[in-house]
Amino acid sequence: MGNQIAVFIDFENIALWAEQEFLDFELTSLVEYLQARGNVALIRAYGDWSRFSRYREDLMHNTVDLIQIYSVRAGKNRADIRMAIDAFEAAIQRPQLDTFVIVSGDSDFGPLVVKLREYGKYTLGIGPREV
């Protein structure tokens, strides 16, 4: 059956980075790249979707589960915490998932990656070069 891939996108972070660099976030090419390497069984994107409504169509076209994270205040991104919990929960509840892709514009996910690897999962981080 090949690799069973789970993708977790810190959308708020990556979209803001792309906008600062005058880039447009386009998910289809990433999904096609991953599909060539296995079955993309799960894709979740985390953010305040009232702020990123222009991306919804592309995300839904790629069967992404949109996880609403309300922006309460500036500071620590609540999406990071929720995304890490969901990824680890998926690793435990769905042991057939063997590859975890973390798409983010920051480096807050190091502890998650270490723990996923302890559980025998292959991890791939995708983000800006400077992260």
Task: List the model feature ranges, each with a label.
Residues 102:
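Non-catalytic, usually N-terminal nucleic-acid engagement modules in DNA/RNA processing proteins
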Residues 1-92, 112-117, 122-123, 129:
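Domain-level signal for Mg2+-assisted phosphodiester chemistry and nucleotide/NA-binding surfaces
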